[in-house]
Regions:
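An extended, acidic
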Residues: 154-299
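Residue-level signal for inorganic ion chemistry
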Residues: 26, 49, 60, 93, ...
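DPxDG-like acidic metal-binding loop motif
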Residues: 79-149, 162
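Solvent-exposed alpha-helices and their adjacent loops that cap or buttress functional pockets
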Residues: 37, 77-79, 117-121, 139, ...
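Generic detector of well-ordered alpha-helical packing
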Residues: 50, 54, 73, 89-92, ...
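N-terminal subdomain of lithium-sensitive/metallo-dependent phosphomonoesterases centered on the IMPase/IPPase/PAP
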Residues: 1-90, 260-267, 274-299
């Protein structure tokens, strides 16, 4: 596996080592099983979440003592610092607890220069996502590209939604005010397929490396999206809110695409939010015509 130079990636490389250590810890818990506690309708936490967050917090303090840490499981340290890490020590806890092998460690670094208003976002400058069961390490630093196990990655070139594999997630609160089932149905009918695997950070990483062309979800938190949002943009993709406005850490919604199907997805969102009848599902002949027209444009 090619190794990235720590002098060129001063934030991501040390964070990657921490993510690997946390991932090894999670893997050990996964192999022996854990007990889950409910903290909402379906949202759970395990001893593995807490142990991973504790380890990450301790390692970050040792390597970056001036940095703040904001963790899903309650860690709040030096939040007035110029640099702030958003960490999800175990994204995909429900999967983990059930033995479903789709989860990760996610760490995103926000830079907040002096004078940044309290209620304004800084800039995400580094992101690390590690899948321990697959031993896949995604990293990015702003302006330097995105990488999977040391090799640069790019979003998929697919130009049409009908040929795209996309993903989504469902809120961890059963009574969330914007249920996603209607959107899931419409996008399933208009894409090559929709996947719902249960770990937003992994889904964003998969958009970045071209395994998915798009991903959308409601009710997310900064620790879910900080790392993945940078991976997507550094891999050449696009990340916005559903209406096309800029994505912010506290947006609570995300639409990440390869940059080619985003407009088509946003148009569908606009129609569905407005209660308008969406266009009929194209016939096979219409699908072929669209495909031929797209191919002609690329020539």
């Amino acid at each position: 596996m090619p190794e990235l130079d720590a002098s060129q990636f001063p934030f991501a490389v040390p964070a990657a080592a921490i993510a690997r250590e946390a991932g090894a810890l999670l893997k050990s818990y996964y192999e022996r099983g854990v007990t889950a506690e409910f903290k909402g309708d379906v949202d759970i936490v395990t001893e593995a979440d807490r142990a991973s967050e504790k380890l990450i917090g301790e390692r970050l303090r040792a390597v970056f003592p001036q940095h703040g840490v904001f963790g899903e499981e309650g860690t709040r340290q030096q939040l007035d610092s110029e640099y702030r890490w958003y960490i999800d020590p175990l994204d995909g806890t429900t999967n983990f607890a059930h033995g479903f092998p789709y989860f990760c460690v996610s760490m995103g670094l926000e830079h907040r220069p002096a004078g940044t208003p309290v209620d304004a976002d800084g800039v995400i400058v580094a992101g690390v996502i590690y899948e321990p069961l697959r031993d896949e390490l995604f990293i990015a630093e702003k302006g330097k590209g995105a990488y999977l196990n040391g090799r640069q990655i790019h979003v998929a070139p697919t130009a049409m939604l009908q040929e795209s594999l996309i993903a989504t997630g469902f809120p961890s609160r059963k009574r969330h005010e914007s249920p996603n089932i209607h959107f899931y149905q419409e996008f399933t009918l208009r894409s090559h397929g929709v996947r719902r695997a249960g770990a937003a950070a992994v889904d964003l990483a998969y958009v970045a490396c071209g395994r998915l062309e798009g991903f959308w979800e409601f009710n997310l938190n900064p620790w879910d999206t900080a790392a993945g949002s940078l991976l997507v943009t550094e891999a050449g993709g696009e990340i916005t809110r559903f209406d096309g406005s800029p994505f912010l850490l506290d947006s609570h919604e995300v639409l990440a695409t390869n940059g080619k199907i985003g407009k088509e997805m946003r148009t569908l969102f606009a129609d569905m939010f407005a209660g308008r009848n969406v266009s009929p599902i194209p016939t096979p002949e219409e699908f072929k015509k669209r495909r031929d027209e797209a191919a002609a444009k690329e020539q």
